[in-house]
Amino acid sequence: MLENIRLSLQGILSHKVRSILTMLGIIIGIAAIIAIVSTIKGTNEQIKNNLIGSGNNNVNVQLYQGESPYDFSYQAAPDGVQVVSAEVRDQITSLKNVESASFYRTRSYCDNVYYQNTQFSGSMYGIDAAYFDTAGYEVQQGRGFLSKEYTNNAKAVILDSTAVKSLYSSESPIGSVIDINGEPFTVVGVVTEVSSFEPVINSEEDYWTYMGTSGGKMFIPGQSWPIAYRYDEPENCLAKAVDTDSMPAVGKKVAELMNATIRTNSVGKEGDSNQIKYDSQDLLKQA
């Protein structure tokens, strides 16, 4: 009788131990899955922030030829693409989830821009009055463009802090003259990005992915662009979304509105390898 009771208690105890071990294994397994998922989500968020930047939410819609941005340095403006009209501008700024929008022209590399004997190797932008607020810049030295300078073909230029470091030693850039394609432009201000976000760099590959190379940026009023470059060049659009997750939809809609103004018979059909069209730089998809 006692032996039966003892065996019964041993059986119950062994089952309980197995149950406890089973439960412990399940708990450990679930915890491991949660940890892995959390790590992956954290890594994805870090990559997203590295590519997009913290609190920026800007979508860049540019004119493309095939898979590459259209290069105005070596090509004339395509016949079927016109300057963005006031009506299209209003439609874009009124889009859902668009906080602000700016329209600009650019040269990604300048081969005939000098301060004294020093050549500038950065980018040139012809901007409107909304650009600095949309892109997240603030005046660090001097001043921004006056309202009249956006409309009266003023030969004024603003540098970013990187351009200042590349061109000047210790002297102030304010009041100095920059030669842009043979035309003298006076420096009226220096701007810097408001956001202090810095990407997390863990390797050399990360550095080139997130930072790249830059000789800085120069900005001139959009109306002054033809003084140094060409008349009636098509513009790009920089649209600021209300949040990061809205960026893909904003980029797609802005590109659709701008593409609707292109004469398709002049720039190729959909699917052509050299088709010219506006497209958004989808950093969120890349992330």
Region roles according to the model:
Residues 1-30:
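N-terminal Sec/SRP start-transfer signal
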Residues 9-13, 41-44, 48, 284-287:
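Alpha-helical membrane-interface segments at transmembrane helix boundaries
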Residues 26, 36-39, 47:
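Juxtamembrane alpha-helical signal-transduction segment immediately C-terminal to a transmembrane helix
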Residues 41-123, 130-133, 148, 226-227, ...:
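Hydrophobic, regular-secondary-structure patches
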Residues 47, 238, 251, 264-287:
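Peri-transmembrane interface segments
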Residues 76-78, 82-91, 103-107, 116-119, ...:
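Subset-of-secretome marker
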Residues 130-144, 155-267:
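Mid-to-C-terminal secondary-structure elements
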